[in-house]
Structures are given as structure tokens and as C-alpha cells.
Amino acid sequence: MLDAFDRYPLTFGPTPIEKLERLTDHLGGKVQLYAKREDCNSGLAFGGNKLRKLEYIIPDAIASGADTLVSIGGVQSNHTRMVAAVAAKIGFKCRLVQEAWVPHEDAVYDRVGNIMLSRIMGADVRLVDDGFDIGIRRSWEEAIEEVKAAGGKPYAIPAGASVHKYGGLGYVGFAEEVRAQEAALGFAFDYIVVCTVTGSSHAGMAVGFAKDGRADHVIGIDASFTPDQTRAQVLEIAQRTADLVKLGREMRPEDIVLVEDYAYPVYGVPSEETKDAIRLVGRLEGMITDPVYEGKSMQGMIDLVKKGYFPEGSKVLYAHLGGAPALNGYGYAFRNG
């Protein structure tokens, strides 16, 4: 599905799938849980899902003649960390807008974790007071104009790389990769669980798995706390991506499954249940999830298993998208583990 598109390799190769034996047993053993470790996909600044997306965006950036990647996210954005890493790797400058997406008061929130790594890698990081929104941001557009005014040649990458024209391609590739791994494993996964906010990971998966009739078996766990906007954006990205890869059918609203129950109390702030899920999977599997994204999708998967959402005997693949560096910004919440 992706042969027609240029790809700039940024990852090690196919990410491993592991059985979550102890978590499976802890939850009763009726649903078999696995994880695909996108958090271990690269040596670039701790890796993560954004690299799959950027592999299909960077060839366009290079071909454009740009010299500066310009992107945006929250203060502890995993995406902007990855943009900074890729800029360093390919010899570009990097301008990052870090907005106040999270009402979080940890004393060192804007000096540790992802934003610290971006600064170490040489990005020009600017803090902005604007609040959370997954759409196109004025502060980002202003940064692009400022780079131009200073004589630079900017290449614009939106939040999460999601609404970029090629933003969904990387996770079409994820689906193709999973199919190859399923052939080696001797079984197919019944469900794939993924955290959904800006939407292109979910959208790309839905398109990729639509090829074999599993689009609506991709279960998005909303972490945006703006589910209507998120659902609409996932569908829009999926429709555009399906056209790009010549899927052969339209992506429909019923292809996009988004569970809304776990994003509370607000984007970027973990509930007690999210923190409990982070601790549980850490103590059972040694697997680290973050308070903004993966902790909430892990909470969701655990709760859905407990509620019987997945039929007995199901094999469920959890897409671990990364994000652990953000934990550093939540040190007080986890001061006792």
C-alpha cells in the first residue's frame, strides 16, 4: 500500500510484539494481551510513534529545499521531541512552539522530560500560554512566518504530524507490519488498542486494517477530552489517507471506534485510575507508560477487559506508542511510586 511513497528510515525496523503474560493472568486469562513496542522503535531520543509518521514526511521536507522544521505541541510534547531529534539527524534547524496544553503545576514541568531533551538537541523552543486544541494553531503559523522573516526556509509539521498530507501513512505501514508478524505468529489479532488524540496513528491503522476488514477492530481510547473533535479529525485523516494509498473504498464514520470513558479529568492530567494502571503494568510487566497518553489507553484496555468488552478468547494487541520521558514532568504525582 505504501510502495509509491518515499520513506526516510528513522527506525530500527519492525517493532517487536510481546505477550503480556502477567497482565493477562492478572485479569483472569480469558483475553490474551499483547503489546507492540513502538516505544522501542529507534535510537533517536527514546523513539516513539511519531517517527513512523516522520519517515514519510521528511522526504518531502528535504525535497522542498527547507532548512528548518517548525512544529508545535504541549510543554511535554513527545512529538516535538521527535521533530527536534529528526532535525538534528538530518542537519536541519528546529523551531518548536510549546503551548500550555495541560493545567499542571509541577514545579519543574517546563524544565525536564521532553522539553529538556528538545533543548539538548538544539531546538529553538518557545513557550506560549495558549491552551489545548488539536487543530491548526495561530502560534505555529506565527513561528513559520518568523523563520521566513529571519531568512530561514521553514517546513511546517502540525501537532502530532497528524493533519499533514502524509501524516497517516506511517500507521498504514504499522498495519502491514502487523499482518506480516501475524503470519509468523500463526494467528491474527482480534482487536488493536491505541491511544487517540490528534488522530493520525488511529487513522492510519484504520486504513491499513481496512484492507482485511478490521478497521472497526482498531479501538481508539480517547485521551483528548474533546472526543467529538478528535473523532472527526480521525475520520478526515483516514479518508484522505485511504485516497492516497488507493484503498479502493471510502472510510466511513462506523470505521472509527473511539471509547470516550478514560480521558478525564482533562487532557494531560492523569486520574487516580490512570495512575493505578501505570503502576500495575509497571509492576507486572516492567513496561512504562506515561500519564498523558499510554497510561490512559492502558487504563482503558484493562477496564474493557474487566467489563467483558472483548469476547472470551480474544487476542488483543496494545499499541505502545511511547512517551515515557513525560513522566519526569509528573514527579510529584509519582513521588512514592
Curated annotation (Swiss-Prot):
* Record carries keyword Transmembrane: no
Chemical reaction(s) catalysed: 1-aminocyclopropane-1-carboxylate + H2O = 2-oxobutanoate + NH4(+)
Query: What are the catalytic residues?
Result: S77
> Which residues carry the post-translational modification N6-(pyridoxal phosphate)lysine, per the record?
K50
- Single GO MF descriptor: 1-aminocyclopropane-1-carboxylate deaminase activity
**Origin: domain of life:** Bacteria
What UniProt keywords apply to this chain's record, in alphabetical order? Answer: Hydrolase, Pyridoxal phosphate
> PANTHER family from the entry?
1-AMINOCYCLOPROPANE-1-CARBOXYLATE DEAMINASE-RELATED
Annotated function? Catalyzes a cyclopropane ring-opening reaction, the irreversible conversion of 1-aminocyclopropane-1-carboxylate (ACC) to ammonia and alpha-ketobutyrate. Allows growth on ACC as a nitrogen source.
| Name assigned to this protein | 1-aminocyclopropane-1-carboxylate deaminase
This chain's source organism reads Allorhizobium ampelinum (strain ATCC BAA-846 / DSM 112012 / S4)
